[in-house]
Amino acid sequence: MQQRRPVRRALLSVSDKAGIIEFAQALSARGVELLSTGGTARLLAEKGLPVTEVSDYTGFPEMMDGRVKTLHPKVHGGILGRRGQDDAIMEQHHIAPIDMVVVNLYLFAETVAREGCSLEDAVENIDIGGPTMVRSAAKNHKDVAIVVKSSDYDAIIKEMDANEGSLTLDTRFDLAIKAFEHTAAYDSMIANYFGSMVPAYHGESKEAAGRFPRTLNLNFIKKQDMRYGENSHQQAAFYIEENVKEASVATAQQVQGKALSYNNIADTDAALECVKAFNEPACVIVKHANPCGVAVSTSILDAYDRAYKTDPTSAFGGIIAFNRELDAETAQAIISRQFVEVIIAPSATEEALKITAAKQNVRVLTCGQWAQRVPGLDFKRVNGGLLVQDRDLGMVSEAELRVVSKRQPTEQELRDALFCWKVAKFVKSNAIVYAKENMTIGIGAGQMSRVYSAKIAGIKAADEGLEVKGSAMASDAFFPFRDGIDAAAAVGVSCVIQPGGSIRDEEVIAAADEHGIAMIFTDMRHFRH
């Protein structure tokens, strides 16, 4: 549908001033009359633009410290008036039609994110007039264009130039959708904030405030449609959070390869989150959301080589993540050695991309460097509900470890224990990881009994000819029986790191002492389901 409406009068009132001067100049140059409020009006006037204050247009001043500015029939009548149907009543009450509304809302999210923000601060940053104008204009999109995103400014001017100062109904409808999405997200933020403040408001523990609101409203933006979901009979799409700053698969830029699949995204997320746990140059190879090889070294090339050797069979068709820039030498090693679905790194050199480009099916993502892990919430959908928890960012330092065995670990055993403890956190429970000299040598994932995960890790190491004797073993949760320790001892493990906390801890510790194994408790569990 191409029904056009000329833009002759626009009302501009924005909190985010990015691009507004240039947009207003472009509108004015095309003969559009400008109405504006408060700070936006002052800014436009300072730039020499002919602008009419809304208070002058309505004959009613701003009042109550700016709480009442645009809530007036001459404003909303001009926006909501149906062209060709309400013309007589508009003329009778001297209401001029407003053809475009340019509004973005008070920065509520930024306000409540500031340290020390009080409930009163939050309340004063709840926009009333803005959402009202946005909804009015979106409702009357057949006649009015509503603009809530500065990223649309250029396209709007281009379309006006192509249509003699008019916008099509298709464009106005699309802008209306964005407007309703904008106000829905805004109201959700406010509802989430107020819901999370209920305990503090009633004088209860402040620790409960700001965490889990009474009603949870989530807003995600569709990034891409997919050919199918986890399986070919399932339809799927990928949605992302708006304004995410953390390096992630959601914010990563795809610089090469065909479109990411549902499973690509899930596995890439698992690989990237694991590699973020390491400060040294690291490589993580993931298959079906589980690490199948992890290593740290002095270079990502050596880290990749060592991670690959853990389980070359599983690495085929896997996802590879690095915490350093992908260089040409490493790219060549990967391409010449294995089939890979996705490579993700903070960045990639031009030479590396030329090499990976030779394999058109290889997807390469760059996500930018990260400073530290960002706290947030994890969600798990269950039928009829949603489980919500803090992200598992828990880590233990060497100083927090407790040696509970008779034998103390050697320095190398301690380093290996801390390394495989980091890896175990990202392996599906029940998780067992064997490691030696900063590389995994066997990973047992997702078994219903812990002892079988331990046995599988040993089998994996033996299959690849990796020496288990003198290695460390990490378990994501406590050992309910001594059998896991016996299985580890049988293949030569010399140090075990685990949370502890079983009613049979003494039995398990006794097994370690019997085998001469050093045992470390972390007092922190890392289930992953």
Swiss-Prot record:
<comment type="pathway">
    <text>Purine metabolism; IMP biosynthesis via de novo pathway; 5-formamido-1-(5-phospho-D-ribosyl)imidazole-4-carboxamide from 5-amino-1-(5-phospho-D-ribosyl)imidazole-4-carboxamide (10-formyl THF route): step 1/1.</text>
</comment>
<comment type="pathway">
    <text>Purine metabolism; IMP biosynthesis via de novo pathway; IMP from 5-formamido-1-(5-phospho-D-ribosyl)imidazole-4-carboxamide: step 1/1.</text>
</comment>
<keyword id="KW-0378">Hydrolase</keyword>
<dbReference type="Pfam" id="PF01808">
    <property type="entry name" value="AICARFT_IMPCHas"/>
</dbReference>
<keyword id="KW-0658">Purine biosynthesis</keyword>
<dbReference type="InterPro" id="IPR011607">
    <property type="entry name" value="MGS-like_dom"/>
</dbReference>
<dbReference type="GO" id="GO:0006189">
    <property type="term" value="P:'de novo' IMP biosynthetic process"/>
</dbReference>
<dbReference type="InterPro" id="IPR024051">
    <property type="entry name" value="AICAR_Tfase_dup_dom_sf"/>
</dbReference>
<comment type="similarity">
    <text>Belongs to the PurH family.</text>
</comment>
<keyword id="KW-0511">Multifunctional enzyme</keyword>
<feature type="domain" description="MGS-like">
    <location>
        <begin position="1"/>
        <end position="148"/>
    </location>
</feature>
<keyword id="KW-0808">Transferase</keyword>
<dbReference type="GO" id="GO:0005829">
    <property type="term" value="C:cytosol"/>
</dbReference>
<dbReference type="InterPro" id="IPR002695">
    <property type="entry name" value="PurH-like"/>
</dbReference>
<dbReference type="Pfam" id="PF02142">
    <property type="entry name" value="MGS"/>
</dbReference>
<dbReference type="GO" id="GO:0004643">
    <property type="term" value="F:phosphoribosylaminoimidazolecarboxamide formyltransferase activity"/>
</dbReference>
<dbReference type="InterPro" id="IPR036914">
    <property type="entry name" value="MGS-like_dom_sf"/>
</dbReference>
<protein>
    <recommendedName>
        <fullName>Bifunctional purine biosynthesis protein PurH</fullName>
        <ecNumber>2.1.2.3</ecNumber>
        <ecNumber>3.5.4.10</ecNumber>
    </recommendedName>
</protein>
<dbReference type="InterPro" id="IPR016193">
    <property type="entry name" value="Cytidine_deaminase-like"/>
</dbReference>
<dbReference type="GO" id="GO:0003937">
    <property type="term" value="F:IMP cyclohydrolase activity"/>
</dbReference>
